[in-house]
């Protein structure tokens, strides 16, 4: 962790702010910077610098999380490009990116269905059972 770098006072302030809001400091650290992680009242685990962190127990879970993040990014970019195509009245662009968006949505639905069939749900915006 170290308290000597630039912005370390801001990090300490953010950590104190999290604790004043009822967050609990965990015995786990952020893989990116080694800072302690905090569990919010909502159950989310956050790094004071990076925000929300997903904790995984295996390499397979890590791959699943990585794939989910990639698909989310593809969805975001596709939606942005659809909007751009609409603004430019470019039917070809809209059609192309709607296809990408539909494929990403289909992949997510299949992945969610297969995980629910296994009895576990992981990831952002879904409850753990």
Curated annotation (Swiss-Prot):
Q: Which Pfam families match?
A: Auto_anti-p27 (PF06677)
InterPro entries assigned to the protein according to its UniProt record, in alphabetical order:
SSSCA1, UPF0148
Q: Which family does it belong to?
A: Belongs to the UPF0148 family.
Q: What is this protein called?
A: UPF0148 protein APE_0207
Q: What is the lineage of its organism?
A: Archaea, Thermoproteota, Thermoprotei, Desulfurococcales, Desulfurococcaceae
């Amino acid at each position: 962790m170290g308290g000597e770098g630039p912005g370390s006072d801001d990090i300490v302030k953010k950590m104190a702010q999290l604790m004043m809001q009822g967050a609990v400091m965990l015995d786990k650290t952020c893989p990116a910077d080694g800072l302690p992680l905090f569990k919010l009242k909502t159950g989310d685990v956050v790094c004071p610098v990076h925000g929300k962190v997903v904790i995984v127990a295996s390499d397979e879970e890590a791959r699943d999380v990585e794939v989910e993040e990639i698909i989310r990014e593809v969805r975001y970019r596709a939606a942005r490009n659809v909007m751009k195509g609409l603004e430019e009245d470019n039917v070809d662009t809209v059609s192309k990116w709607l296809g990408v968006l539909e494929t990403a949505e289909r992949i997510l639905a299949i992945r969610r269905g297969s995980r629910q069939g296994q009895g576990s749900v992981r990831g952002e915006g879904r409850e753990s059972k």
